[in-house]
Amino acid sequence: MRILFMGTPDIAAESLNALIAAGHDICAVFTRADKPVGRKQILTAPPVKQTAEANGIPVYQPRTLRDGSSDELIKSLAPDIIVVVAYGCIIPPQLLHVAKYGCINLHVSLLPKYRGSAPIQWAVLNGDAETGVTIMQLDEGVDTGDILYVQPVAIDPDMTSGELFDRVSAIGAKTLVEVLPKIKAGKLTPKKQEESLATKAPSLTKEMAQFDFTQPAAHIHNWVRGMNPWPMAFFMHDGKKIKVTASKLSENPANAAPGSVLAVKPLTIACQDGAIVLDSVTPEGGKSMAGTAWAAGRRLKAGDSL
């Protein structure tokens, strides 16, 4: 198929690579603007642009599609279908039906659950055992279009958002390649989303990453997993942020007040119910270290309180 691809980050680049490998004709790529990256703020092309340029595919980076300035260009490209994967720009109504087979989107949740920009993270934050990949027709809403295909994806108990992102990216790319021939053959029947089941997945903020030990151990563990790799879950100790990069639920009962140190090898803290092991932490202004090493540096012992 002749495809106009719209996407920006790594997950979109993986899908673009899969479509290229499958032999599809990618007539052009639309992506977001290059951005300064890292401490030195080096202007860097988004992953999709890098992939497109490596394969000799024309790249366009309009600031917006809403003003109509790209309409004639897109029409002139004459795509069979427009494929959108984490583009980051709203597709306006006048472009939804330009292509013969319309405009489809790959969304990484089991829609209508987790509409929004952070579906992977919220699935982990909420302790879900399953998420998925949904191929949907784009409409004028945010992730509200008719569903064409759903592929469930398992979430392992200790999996981080970053690890789930990698899993979903690969499955999403594979699913997209498998679904396109079915769309062309007219074998998929669009299904309306059940609005009563809709939930939102808003973007994460640094402030949202904070937890405290008066919360349930399972909630804290999910927070540590879901906020990894960004912004990283943290608790406050002596006025400093202590980020927790890895944790696990303790099998031992917590017969102590929340925040009590139950053990330092491994560093185990009592919670509202149960206890959590802090395997790896990053003190404010410091480097990542084992929870046990941090506890030793703070001269913590069983019975102390965080």
Features from the language model and the residues they span:
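N-terminal Rossmann-like dinucleotide-binding module
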Residues: 1-39
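Short beta->alpha connector loops
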Residues: 8-11, 63-66, 87-90, 227, ...
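A residue-level signal for conserved active-site and pocket-lining positions in enzyme catalytic cores
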Residues: 7, 29, 52, 82, ...
